[in-house]
């Protein structure tokens, strides 16, 4: 639980990430505008921003992965995934800004500094308490 909270605290320090709550069955994409430091009460952590919040049962977080996933065309997504008891059970994902998109979600030339932020996080956490790095190919229908 300590590594989970350490990572959540660090991820909530900037409001340029997108938080996706839930997994394959139901999910909610949320801006991190106004995100606050997480608050712990018992086994639950509350993550809150200007227009949303969620309560995560820390006991359900059984895995953390730093993921680079092929997404649309030649673009990649960079995120941290908190998984549940079943590995495919995604609880929360935190997406770093896409290096191929500007702040208005318009396609631009690749911005390597956006990948650097992800890589710095990854390099600090992967290997600690079972945290993994995963590269995912594009999902086919």
Task: Describe the role of every protein-language-model region.
Residues 2, 11, 64-141:
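Acidic, Ser/Thr- and proline-rich intrinsically disordered linker/docking segments
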Residues 1-58, 62-68, 127-141:
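N-terminal recruitment modules of adaptor/scaffold proteins
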């Amino acid at each position: 639980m300590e590594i989970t909270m350490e990572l959540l605290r660090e991820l909530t320090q900037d409001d340029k990430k997108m938080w996706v709550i839930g997994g394959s069955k139901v999910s909610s994409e949320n801006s991190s505008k106004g995100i606050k430091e997480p608050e712990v009460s018992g086994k639950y952590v509350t993550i809150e921003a200007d227009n949303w919040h969620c309560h995560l049962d820390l006991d359900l977080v059984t895995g953390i992965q730093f993921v680079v996933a092929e997404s649309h065309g030649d673009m990649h997504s960079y995120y941290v995934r908190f998984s549940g008891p079943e590995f495919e059970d995604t609880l929360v994902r935190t997406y770093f800004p896409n290096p191929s998109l500007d702040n208005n979600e318009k396609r631009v030339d690749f911005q390597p500094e956006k990948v650097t932020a992800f890589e710095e996080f990854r390099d600090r956490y992967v290997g600690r308490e079972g945290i993994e790095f995963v590269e995912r190919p594009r999902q086919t229908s």
